[in-house]
Amino acid sequence: MKTELNNPRDKIKVVTMNGSLMPLNKAKVSVTAPGLSYAALVFEGIRAYWNDKLNELYLFRLDEHLVRFANSMRLLKFSDFPETSIIKEDILKNLKANNYQEDIYIRLQGYIDDWGEMAVQTPVSTSIVSYPRPRAVAFKEGKNFTVSSWKRLDDNASPPR
C-alpha cells in the first residue's frame, strides 16, 4: 500500500536476507519466528550521507554500529550469529546494488528465525534494508533545547526504562 507519491520504498532495488540479495517482495519471515512472535530481535539504524562534490556515499561510524549490534545479540544470548566482518560486507554489497546517490538510512536486524519459544537462541537470521532518508531539517536550521531542573527517578524506585 502506497501512502505517498514519492515513497522511499520505490527506490529499493534489493534487500539482504542472510547474506543474499533479493527483491523486497521476495524477503519473507515466518509468522512463527520468535523474532516476530516474541520480539526476539536486535537492530541498528545506520546513516549514510551522500557527498555531491565527491560523488560518494559515506557511512557514519559503521564499525561502532556493528560492535554494538554484535554486543546486543550476545546480550540476548543469540547463538551462531554472523561475524561483524561478514555483516559489513553484506551492507556494502547492499548499498552497491541499490546504487543510491542521496542520504540513506540502513536498518540492520538480527532475529531468531524459523520456529520456537521465547527462550530459543538459534537460528539467527539477519536482514538489511536501506532506503533514502533525507537529513532532518534541524541539520541546517539548528534546534533549541531547554535543560530541565527535574531529576530523573532512580531506577530502583520505579524502573521507568
Give the location of each predicted region.
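Helix-start/capping segments and mature chain N-termini
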Residues: 1-79, 86-93, 117-161
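Short, acidic/charged, Gly/Pro-enriched secondary-structure junctions
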Residues: 87-115
